[in-house]
Amino acid sequence: MMDTYFTITVYSNNPDRAGKAITEAFNKIKKIESELSVYDDESELARLNRKKVLKAPSQDLKKNIERALYYSNLTDGAFDITVHPILDLYGRTFMEKGIPPAGETIKRELKKVDYKRVLVKEDLIRIGDDQLITLGGIAKGYAVEEAVKILRSHNITMALIDAGGNMRAMGIKPEGVWNIAMEDPRDMNNYITIVPLDNNAV
């Protein structure tokens, strides 16, 4: 899901309740993926990128774009969901030639990157005619937090959600905090430190 894996670990003395909570959480994650994935041609986000305007968007899509624009304003554009043409350019060039794209090509694509051209209204989202957006920098975290809400609604208090290495802990395990090993980037068979999680994320 979302071009990565999700695992949910739950501690509960009620297996049926835990099973229902996990199933509902995964269903919500799948629903979010069907709306926000840039890899699914039938997703709402893909339709927005094709048509440049989307009427009656889902709340998940609207919330994520609004949140992304908030962070774009906060960072003065350092975080920008309209960066997709640049990501696509680098991906294609490395795939075809094994080298970074040429400077002039990058400059041309950079003209499409401007979060201020994204318009969000109550029942409509519009992007520039030459723009493409990606929610890869925000959607996975949103999906995790939505899964946390569902687990809590089932009175689950001890859980760990692993979203492709992004870890979100709910409370602690019966034996204590969740100990998360941070992989050594130079040696995948080793780790560089252990991070204890207690109702937080890394």
Label the predicted regions.
Residues 1-202:
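Mature catalytic core of soluble alpha/beta enzymes
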